[in-house]
Amino acid sequence: MTTLRMSTLPKTWVLDVDGTIVVHNGHLRPVGDELLPGVKEFFASLPPQDVVVLLTARKKEIGPRLEAFLADHHIRFDTILYELPAGERILVNDCKPSGLPTAFAVNKKRDEPLSIHVVRDETL
C-alpha cells in the first residue's frame, strides 16, 4: 500500500486508465473492461471537491463505451484525455511558498490492486 500525506486543500487526481484502474487492454477482450481491486474504494474515498482527470491511449471513438462502463461502476471523473502516447507520463508543478509539495507520483505494477491511502494532515 502507498501512503500519501497531504494537505486538506482540494486536489487534482491524474490517473491512467489501463492497468491502473481497469485490466490493461481489457476493452479488447470479449468480456470487456474490468475494474481492478481497490478502485471502487479509492474513488469512493475522494472528497467531492477533488477533480479527477483520466489518461488513456485509447482512441476517442471508443470513449463512450469506457465512459458508460465507468458510470455503471460509479467511477467519477471530470475529464478523460484520449489518444495519448504510450510512453512516460510526466507531471511538473511548483511548490507552495510555504514549501508544501504540490505534485506526487505513484508508480504501481500493471493490473495490481489500486492501494493508495491518503492521510489528510491539517498541519500542512
Task: Go through each PLM region and give its residues.
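HAD-like aspartate-dependent phosphatase fold
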Residues: 1-124
